[in-house]
Structures are given as C-alpha cells and as structure tokens.
C-alpha cells in the first residue's frame, strides 16, 4: 500500500488569546522541568533532534513550518544527520534518510518495528483496525493477513482474476482511442484522468466485478460516480498519516484543530455510499442461496468459512478490507504513469526506445498483455526510476516499535514511529549518481539477466513496503503498474501539445504528484483493428 501523499496544512486557527495563554503555560512548564533528573536519560543517546517542549514536544514548530515533511527534511539537513528524533506530544518520530540505517530498522530489527501507529484517519478508514495494512500488530492483523495471502494474492487467484484486469486494460485503450482517433493528427488528452481511472477501476473490477458505480461514459471514461469515489479514496490516503495534531494530543481531538477529521469522515461517507449497497446486496444473495460460486474477490471473502463452518469474516471485516484493497492501488500506478510520460516527453529518445521494445516483444498486431510484462525490462526500468525520483509520498508507512531498541548506535524507545524518507533515499547523492536526473538505464545496468524487479530490497529507495509489514501483492502491483505504462506507450504516439514547447516539472508543494495534470498529444500508432470497440 502506498503512503499518503503529504502532511497537510491546517485550515483551522485557534483563538489568539487561547494560543497566547497556552504558549505562556508551556514556557513556565519548560522552566520548571529544566532541572529534571539527568539520571533518567538512557546511556545510549536518542538520535539528534530539536529540544522538545513539555507535553507538546515539537508540535508548535511543526505547526508553524507546514507542510510537515518539508520541515522534517529541512531540520535533518540543518542537523546534518541521517536519523533524527522529533518528539510530537509524547511520541518519538524517527525519520531516516540513509539506506544503511533503513536496513537496520526493517531488516536487522524488523520484528521490533512491526506495528503501526494509531491515528484518527486510519482508525476510521479501517473501521477500527479490522484490516491489514494500517492495523497495529496483533491477532486481527494476523487473521486478515492470512486471508489475503491465501485467498487474494496467491498465484492461482491472481490468474483467476486475469480476465477482469484485461477488461480494464482494454477499456483504458478504448477511452484514449475514442478521444484521439477522429483527427489524423490525434488530440490532446488529460493523461492523469485516464491513468487515475484505470488505477481505480482495475481493483474495483476484481472486487465488485464492475467498472462503474453508475452508467459511466460512452467513450469508456469515468462518470461522476467514479470520479467522486476515486477522489474520496485519495483523500483518505492523504490524511492517513498526516501528522494530525490530535494523533499526538488526543485531548484536542474534540476541537479538530487542523480540520482533518471532518475531511476524513466526509470522504469515508462517500466511499461507503458507493460500496456498501453492493456489499449488502451481495451478502443477502449468498444468504438466500442465489449465489454459490465466487465470481470476484467480494464473493471469495463472503464464502470463506472457519473450522466450524461459520463465516470466517464478519460483514464489517469484508467492508473494511474491500476498501483497503482499493486504497492500495488507487494512487501509485497513475503517479508512475504520469511522471514517466512527463520525463519521457522531455527525452524523446526514451519514448523511441520503449516503443522499439514493445514492437520487438509484442508487435503491432495485438495489444500488450500481462504475459509480456516480464520481457519488457526497459519499461520496467522506467517505472522503477519514477519510484526512485518521483515517489508517491514523502515517507513510507510508519513502523512502530513494540519494545525499546538500539539502532545505529541510538536508543529508540518503545512506541517510536519510524518513517523512511522516500524523497531523500531516492535522491541521495551518496547512493545515486546524478540523483535528480531521470535515467532508467541505471536499473538495467545492475539487473541480472535484464530482469528488472520493481521491489527495492536493499532500501536504496522505497518502492513497496518490506519485512513483516511488507506488501503482500508486490507481484500483482508491479504488473498493474507496468501494464498501465505499457498500454499507454504501445497504443499511442505521444508528443507535446501544439501550443506547448516546454514540459512543466513543477512538483506540488504539499503533495508530491505533478502540480498540474499532464496534457499531451496522443495519436494511435497501431492498426485500427487492434483497438477495442
């Protein structure tokens, strides 16, 4: 699962008098506690970091310097450190920018850092931690992980769902073809809309066996319902681990100071509006005996039985897990496809090389299929390079320590939230030559037998989560990403719009996606008979 995009600015400002009184109170408390017992300091030091205020820690500094991820990265550069300790409330947040230290956490000490933090947003989106990805370490997490490994991501199940994925890949090509085939010079299309629709619809198809919640569009594109649903899912991802003030000072939650809770609940209501009627109807069909064979993942979850022949999953577990599965694929594929095309338009020789690979491996008489994906090393390298240079979020999902530990010579207290910096790992000049240059060849040069694996096991950057909390669907996720990019590159010739002479590479300051959607000139490059009707 992908990390939320960023850590957002609050839109709610507390009264000035209350803020002033609070600041004065903090000064007094800090003065009184300045002479605390030095013997309480552990022999092994904490990682370097700012001096925290009593009770609130460094929350005031974070609040003043939003977005939080840029403040954290700036602070680490100021401290000249690859690991820091920032206390927010009573929680120690441990950001890491070095692959060596990252490996100490998630490889050498993986068992200790196998939990997740409790946040307002993740508790809401998981219906009280009934799911896998965001749930804290424990029996419920183990139960749901067993279900997904055995029933959703095993090779036979992934193959069983191939036809549904093919339908969505064909629909993507149909949608773009309908937009650009009428004119011999093609047409300008919004790449983000197409890629985002595919990213949402492919899991929707596998879970609910439907592309649309409503009627959709005649050209194959998303309708109002699909756009609303995807937007709500992206909102949930955005706020899942967004440094919400009340996650560190729970007694402030009633005030919703940064406005996160209102947005999360609104987004969750939208998701439920579209999904729950389908789930409820399907549950009733199984109970009434109208269904007895699975047709999609929703059916699979409903049909599972425990040792006593009773339903293995409750209705609420099914609803929560189907939501989390959609969250896992809705952001990363479209982010990779959009940034890859942006970079390749800036270096047209890369477009040519990708097209040549597709023509050599697939040809022009058929559309690229999942069976071709392992034989497309250059396109896989392009996707991997986007993961390095343009990550979907600034940090990975937080790992929480379930016991005190010593890592890289520092004391890491129980309950610490460890976050690996996707930005700084992927752009680290000590690891990557010309780190800000988009260069897919760097991954081909180190690949064994030209097999480019999108998973980065050495944590030189973060692609998929790893270790005990690692992504269960790495293979499927990699295939979805490469298929999206390959279908875009094989089906259409891409160029800058007629009135544009320069690519805009501006990165959103709050999110990490491209600040503005990619608009590009698309023109069919295959015989008309190949395109789905």
From Swiss-Prot:
Pfam families registered for this protein in UniProt: p450
Catalytic activity field: L-tryptophan + 2 reduced [NADPH--hemoprotein reductase] + 2 O2 = (E)-(indol-3-yl)acetaldehyde oxime + 2 oxidized [NADPH--hemoprotein reductase] + CO2 + 3 H2O + 2 H(+)
Enzyme Commission no: 1.14.14.156
Gene3D superfamilies found in the cross-reference section: Cytochrome P450
Keywords, sorted A to Z: Glycoprotein, Heme, Iron, Membrane, Metal-binding, Monooxygenase, Oxidoreductase, Transmembrane, Transmembrane helix
Bilayer topology annotation: Single-pass membrane protein
Required cofactor names: heme
Amino acids binding heme: 471
InterPro entries to which the protein is assigned, alphabetical: Cyt_P450, Cyt_P450_CS, Cyt_P450_E_grp-I, Cyt_P450_sf
Keyword Transmembrane: yes
TM spans (from-to): 12-32
GO molecular function annotation: heme binding; iron ion binding; tryptophan N-monooxygenase activity
Subcellular location: Membrane
GO cellular component: membrane
Tissue: Confined to buds.
Listed PROSITE patterns: CYTOCHROME_P450 (PS00086)
Major subcellular location class: membrane
Matching SUPFAM superfamilies: Cytochrome P450
Glycosylation sites: 209
Role this protein plays: Catalyzes with low efficiency E and Z isomers of indole-3-acetaldoxime from tryptophan (Trp).
Family: Belongs to the cytochrome P450 family.
Name of this chain's protein: Tryptophan N-monooxygenase CYP79A68
Gene: CYP79A68
